[in-house]
Amino acid sequence: MKSPSAAVTEDNETAGVSSKAESPPASTEDLAAQKREARLRKFRELHLKTNEARKLNHQEVVEEDKRQKLPSNWEARKARLEWELKEEEKKRECAANGVDYERAKLLEISAEDAERWERKKKRKNPDLGFSDYAAAQLRQYQRLTKQIKPDMEEYEMEKQKQGEMFYPTSESLYHGTHIPSQSGIDRMVTDLEKQIEKREKYSRRRAYNDDADIDYINERNAKFNKKAERFYGKYTAEIKQNLERGTAV
């Protein structure tokens, strides 16, 4: 004999099965309508995305046209002006707070920026291109003096020997009385010989031929005569021969 609860469960299951059996399946037209609605929804989404992309492309084209009409160095000038505005703002803030601006600026510099600045400062004697002969001569002098390595042991010995006179003042008589050592003179002579050897190696001046005829008064005139001979020599060969023989009319 079944319990009342089991009977109720069987009745519920029977009712559910009968209800499922009674509900009619979805028709083919409803399925087609659902698919069509999904396609239309997707099409609308794609259409909205296309319109948005078109607007963004148009905005980018307008911005690119504006950038092309600006001066070539506009970006650099803009960045420079923005930096100057920030610097002025910081200066005003420091002045209002009673803080030294340079000190506050140093506190904001990172370790990487400080190292990069130090490396930049260590680049001595940079080649900035030719400006005048005096600057070129000064740069050469700095380069040559840098190549001569000092004798630090001799320097320390001389420093201990002279004492306070090693750092002369306006009242000192030590200036001009120093006599260089023989090793220092030898280093200077060696460096001068290297300079002469290097200068001779890179010299483009051609040696003169002692046996050749001299038909010039200076080097500039010699170059002009060679150029004239190259272009007109074949036309003036007979005239030169007559002049040399003394038979010219």
UniProtKB/Swiss-Prot annotation:
Belongs to the SYF2 family. Residues 1-36 are annotated as: Disordered. This is Pre-mRNA-splicing factor syf2. It comes from the Eukaryota. The lineage of its organism: Eukaryota, Metazoa, Chordata, Craniata, Vertebrata. It is found in: Nucleus. Involved in pre-mRNA splicing as component of the spliceosome. Residues 72-100 form a coiled coil. Identified in the spliceosome C complex. The gene is syf2. Keywords: Coiled coil, mRNA processing, mRNA splicing, Nucleus, Spliceosome. One of its GO terms (cellular component) is nucleus. It holds the Pfam family SYF2. GO terms for biological process: mRNA splicing, via spliceosome.
